[in-house]
């Protein structure tokens, strides 16, 4: 385990009891213990090869990483190191070092476990910047990610208060879809592909494919445009067109583990654009629709982490040079073997058609049914795995689905911006298949 160097170089601690005294010496190589919060690395006089941390008052744990004085959490609780260890229903948390938890993304054996507060205990933590501290809880044969019974230090929130219209953890009696609305303000600045929370992109849909052996793999992103409909890219499904093969998650921000409040859907209809085509690089008419239902026949239910995105007005796209958000589980480099575990977001700027059709860009490959967008510094971009996901821009004062991640050469390559399906050119197609049902909003 990677350790933090937080010990002094030399000191002597003498501990006495009624039977005599035992000398404990701080080692000159004290950093080997990885003591935190003022803890001192000591060894027994006659067993110098046995080292441990001697913790100051209020701190416990192998590395003095547990703060017994913390009875509430600040912010989203990422720095919480207290001893709460039950979910909001009182179920005990599983130890982070238990054999079953080790199969999950966050556990005590990660190289960065100490920095994340994970260790040989079952205390609530928030290693992935979710809404509040959480833990794994055993429910039947399943391990579930559950929010914890620990209050916010602000004092305005227990684990489930009455709804006041402002508290992000409260539960209103009735929530309605309001397209383009999210709990967090738009972040129209370059963020370098940083991890984000699903509340920042609550319309994002994660699409997976089932395999014959029972395994499930991530395929593409999508966007919720009405309670029952997700829009994505046809090229994601062109090789496997059986709707029964696909699963859609809303409200999910981690690739292989559940997120509190997420919803799982089967695909009732899979509609690929009839004029889709692809050449050596470009994808044409690259748009698809998925009608979704839960196993109980329900469409999506609105929440802080599940919301629809507005469709753009006809011929009313954001102006070239505008900043837009992209989000997904895409690889940082096309040569990467694995997709990142955490949902990521970055910001790009729309590139004019005239510029994108220059020979050193893409030339005639780019049509008027496409949009180009890029980071001006060519440092961030959509990449493999982001396909089908949203390009969200502010249009006429509201957030709209301006584009769908479609194609491009490499990722963040100079003079090779990402190319997106131009949604405003497919509004008639969308309405033809969706009809007047299900609350499509512009």
Curated annotation (Swiss-Prot):
It comes from the Eukaryota. It catalyses: Specific cleavage of Arg-|-Val bond in plasminogen to form plasmin. Residues 72-153 form the Kringle domain. The active site is at residues 235, 286, 387. Residues 36-59 are annotated as: Binds urokinase plasminogen activator surface receptor. Inhibited by SERPINA5. Inhibited by SERPINE1. Residues 154-189 are annotated as: Connecting peptide. Keywords: Disulfide bond, EGF-like domain, Glycoprotein, Hydrolase, Kringle, Plasminogen activation, Protease, Secreted, Serine protease, Signal, Zymogen. Residues 190-435 form the Peptidase S1 domain. Found in high and low molecular mass forms. Each consists of two chains, A and B. The high molecular mass form contains a long chain A which is cleaved to yield a short chain A. Forms heterodimer with SERPINA5. Binds LRP1B; binding is followed by internalization and degradation. Interacts with MRC2. Interacts with PLAUR. In complex with SERPINE1, interacts with PLAUR/uPAR. Interacts with SORL1 and LRP1, either alone or in complex with SERPINE1; these interactions are abolished in the presence of LRPAP1/RAP. The ternary complex composed of PLAUR-PLAU-PAI1 also interacts with SORLA. One of its GO terms (cellular component) is extracellular space. Specifically cleaves the zymogen plasminogen to form the active enzyme plasmin. It is found in: Secreted. CDD domains: KR, Tryp_SPc. Residues 29-65 form the EGF-like domain. GO terms for molecular function: serine-type endopeptidase activity. Belongs to the peptidase S1 family. Glycans are attached at residue 152. This is Urokinase-type plasminogen activator. Produced as an inactive single-chain protein (pro-uPA or sc-uPA), is processed into the active disulfide-linked two-chain form of PLAU/uPA by a proteolytic event mediated, at least, by TMPRSS4. Residues 1-20 form the signal peptide. Its EC number is 3.4.21.73. The lineage of its organism: Eukaryota, Metazoa, Chordata, Craniata, Vertebrata. One of its GO terms (biological process) is regulation of cell adhesion mediated by integrin. Disulfide bonds join 33-41, 35-53, 55-64, 72-153, 93-135, 124-148, 179-310, 220-236, 228-299, 324-393, 356-372, 383-411.
